[in-house]
Amino acid sequence: MNIISVGVNHKTAPIEIRERIALSEVQNKEFITDLISSGLAHEAMVVSTCNRTELYVVPAMTEVTGEYLKEYLISFKDARKEVRPEHFFSRFYCGTARHLFEVSSAIDSLVLGEGQILGQVKDAYRIAAEVQAAGILITRLCHTAFSVAKKVKTKTKIMEGAVSVSYAAVELAQKIFSNLSMKKILLIGAGETGELAAKHMCQKNARNIVITNRTLSKAEALAEELGTGKVLPFESYKEYLHEFDIIITAVSTKEYVLREAEMHQSMQKRRLKPVIILDLGLPRNVDPDISRLQNMFLKDIDALKHIIDKNLEKRRGELPKVQAIIEEELVSFGQWINTLKVRPTIVDLQSKFIEIKEKELERYRYKVSEEELRRMEHLTERILKKILHHPIKMLKAPIDTSDSIPSRVNLVRNIFDLEEPNQ
C-alpha cells in the first residue's frame, strides 16, 4: 500500500506560485472529495498554508503517480500558465512519512522551530476526516506525526528562544524585569509589529499596556482586542513618559518619536528607576543617544536580530535530536505498514484453520455431549493458536536485507495452500 506526497513549499517555489496553488478550506474539501469519488484515491489530505500546499494521497490505481497528482492539482486550480511540475516535490512510501514528520515537528518550516505548522496539519486532518477522506493509513500517519511533534517539543529545545523581532523584544524585557505583570508598558504604534509585540506581552502576563497611535481609533481597537482598554492621544503621550517602565516603538516615521532631552526629563521624574525602550521601527524611531542615560536600556532591531541569530543557532544545534526522534518513529510506522501488507494473508490463514476446525467438530456434534463438545472447541482453539503463532509472528517480523514482505506472504500461502487474494 503506497502513500504519495506531492506539493509546493517555500523550498521549491516562489511566493507567487505558492499563492496561486493554495487551497481554501472549501477548495480543500472539494479537491479531496473529487479524488475519492472519481476512484483515483482511497484516502487523501491536503495541508495548505501560506508557505506550502501539500497533497497526501493513497492511490486507488497504479496510474495515480506523483506526476499525475501534480497535473491534477494544477488543472484543479486552472494554473497551467503560471505553475509547472518542476515547482513541485514528490515523496513516496516512508519518504512521505518522513516529510510529514519533519513538517509537523517544525524543522521544515520557513523559520526553524516555528510551531504554528502543527495546528495547520491538524486542521488538514480534520478537513479530510470531515469528508471521510482520512482512512486507516492517513489517520495512522497523522497521529504518528502528532506524536512526533509532541516528543520533539518536550524532549528538545528546537522551539525555544525568540526568532521574531517582536517576540525577541518581549523576551528581553522579561529577562530584565522578570515579572511583567507589575510593569507599566507604553506601545507607540498600533500597526502589525506593534500589535504582535503587545500580544506577546499579554502572553507573558503583562496587564498594564497603554497604546498610542496617530489614528486614535486604531489604538482603541487594539486596546479592546487586548482587553487593556487604555489609550493615549498621540499628541500628548510625551507628557506621561515618566510613568512607564517599558516603552515599545513601532511606527513608520523619518523622525525620532523619542529624543534624549525628553527622556532625560522623564528619568529625573522617575528618580532614575530603570526603563527599557524597545525600538522596533525601521527606520529607527528612537534617538540612539538615549542609551547614554543612566538606567536607560535601549535595544533596536539590529540588537534584537543578534539575539534571534543566537537563538536560531541554538535551534540548529537541536536538529540531531529531532532527527533521532523522527527515525525512531519511522521504524515503528514502517513496521505497522508491513502489518497492513500481511494482514490479508493472516486473515486468510486464520479463516482456513477455523473452517477446518468447524468442519471437524461438526462431525462429532451429535456423537458427544454438549459439555464434551465445549471442551473440544476450547481445546481446538488453543491448538490453533499455537499452530498459527509462529507463521503469524514470522509475517509480522521486521524485514531485513535478505527478506521481503512478498516473499514471506508467498511462502505462507504456498505452504498452507491459500488462494490468492481477489480470486
From Swiss-Prot:
NCBIfam families: hemA (TIGR01035). Possesses an unusual extended V-shaped dimeric structure with each monomer consisting of three distinct domains arranged along a curved 'spinal' alpha-helix. The N-terminal catalytic domain specifically recognizes the glutamate moiety of the substrate. The second domain is the NADPH-binding domain, and the third C-terminal domain is responsible for dimerization. The gene is hemA. One of its GO terms (biological process) is protoporphyrinogen IX biosynthetic process from glutamate. SUPFAM superfamilies: Glutamyl tRNA-reductase catalytic, N-terminal domain, Glutamyl tRNA-reductase dimerization domain, NAD(P)-binding Rossmann-fold domains. Substrate binds at residues 49-52, 109, 114-116, 120. It catalyses: (S)-4-amino-5-oxopentanoate + tRNA(Glu) + NADP(+) = L-glutamyl-tRNA(Glu) + NADPH + H(+). It is an enzyme of class 1 (oxidoreductase). This is Glutamyl-tRNA reductase. Gene3D superfamilies: Glutamyl-tRNA reductase, N-terminal domain, NAD(P)-binding Rossmann-like Domain. Pathway: Porphyrin-containing compound metabolism; protoporphyrin-IX biosynthesis; 5-aminolevulinate from L-glutamyl-tRNA(Glu): step 1/2; Porphyrin-containing compound metabolism; chlorophyll biosynthesis. The active site is at residue 50. NADP(+) binds at residues 189-194. The record marks 99 as: Important for activity. Pfam families: GlutR_dimer, GlutR_N, Shikimate_DH. It comes from Chlorobium limicola (strain DSM 245 / NBRC 103803 / 6330). The keyword NADP applies. Disulfide bonds: none annotated. InterPro entries: 4pyrrol_synth_GluRdtase (IPR000343), 4pyrrol_synth_GluRdtase_dimer (IPR015896), 4pyrrol_synth_GluRdtase_N (IPR015895), GluRdtase_CS (IPR018214), GluRdtase_dimer_dom_sf (IPR036453), GluRdtase_N_sf (IPR036343), NAD(P)-bd_dom_sf (IPR036291), Shikm_DH/Glu-tRNA_Rdtase (IPR006151). The keyword Transmembrane helix does not apply. Homodimer. During catalysis, the active site Cys acts as a nucleophile attacking the alpha-carbonyl group of tRNA-bound glutamate with the formation of a thioester intermediate between enzyme and glutamate, and the concomitant release of tRNA(Glu). The thioester intermediate is finally reduced by direct hydride transfer from NADPH, to form the product GSA. Keywords: Chlorophyll biosynthesis, NADP, Oxidoreductase, Porphyrin biosynthesis. Belongs to the glutamyl-tRNA reductase family. Signal peptide: none annotated. Catalyzes the NADPH-dependent reduction of glutamyl-tRNA(Glu) to glutamate 1-semialdehyde (GSA). Its EC number is 1.2.1.70.
